[in-house]
Structures are given as C-alpha cells and as structure tokens.
From Swiss-Prot:
Keywords: Ribonucleoprotein, Ribosomal protein, RNA-binding, rRNA-binding. This is Large ribosomal subunit protein uL14. Pfam families: Ribosomal_L14. InterPro entries: Ribosomal_uL14, Ribosomal_uL14_bac-type, Ribosomal_uL14_CS, Ribosomal_uL14_sf. Binds to 23S rRNA. Forms part of two intersubunit bridges in the 70S ribosome. Belongs to the universal ribosomal protein uL14 family. The lineage of its organism: Bacteria, Pseudomonadati, Pseudomonadota, Betaproteobacteria, Burkholderiales. GO terms for cellular component: cytosolic large ribosomal subunit.
Length: 122
C-alpha cells in the first residue's frame, strides 16, 4: 500500500534511484495505491547522467509492494520493498530496461510493455 509521502525505489534505467509519491491517481479522495496503480511521483534521488533529474514530476506505475497482492487461489505475493516504473504523459515507460521481478497483475492492456521488458514475471 502506497500513500502520499511514501518513498519507492525505481525499477528501471531512467536514472532515478528513489521517488516519492505525491498523489494517488483515480478518485478525489483515494488514499492508497497497490500493484498496477498509477501514482504521481517526484524524483528525490537521481544518478548524475540519467534521463531524469532530481525534483522533476512524473507518472509512475507501482510494480512491487511490501504489502503484496492476494491472488484468486488464496496465495499472497510479497516483496522486500516498494518499487515503481516511471511513465511519460502517454503512460508509456520512459526507461528501456526493467530491474527485478514484476507480478502477473500488470498484464493488462496498459502495461504489457513493462511485462515484456521484465526479467521475471511472478
């Protein structure tokens, strides 16, 4: 569960290392985001020669949460930390590589690109 002010690691090669959630998109009073939800983020830590700079605002999709996701068969998939992939205004990934596993819940029409780039789909 990600909420405003939550810090997430970045799971792509855009040059951002850490981002902070500044808004959960989808509804005026929506408080939490989980895997597959789109959030608005601010870059808090970036590498020197990356595509993105510290302080810039982007859309991002949550790909891993410590809270996890419950499957239809009753199983629960949890991760060690929270991670997101940065998106442009057309909701396409900015980076060309994805690091770490992602869940099958991202296999919607919108995020097939992320699933195809990921090294492992759980």
């Amino acid at each position: 569960m990600i909420q405003t002010e939550s810090r997430l690691e970045v799971a792509d090669n855009t040059g951002a290392r850490e981002v902070m959630c500044i808004k959960v998109l989808g509804g005026s009073k929506r408080r939490y985001a989980s895997i597959g939800d789109i959030i608005k983020v601010s870059v808090k830590e970036a590498t020197p020669r990356g595509r993105v700079k510290k302080g810039e605002i982007y859309n991002a999709v949550v790909v891993r949460t410590a809270k996890g996701v419950r499957r239809q068969d009753g199983s629960l998939i949890k991760f060690d930390g929270n991670a997101a992939v940065l998106l442009n205004n057309k909701l396409e990934p900015i980076g060309t590589r994805i690091f770490g596993p992602v869940t099958r819940e991202l296999r919607s029409e919108r995020f097939m690109k992320i699933v195809s780039l990921a090294p492992e789909v759980l």
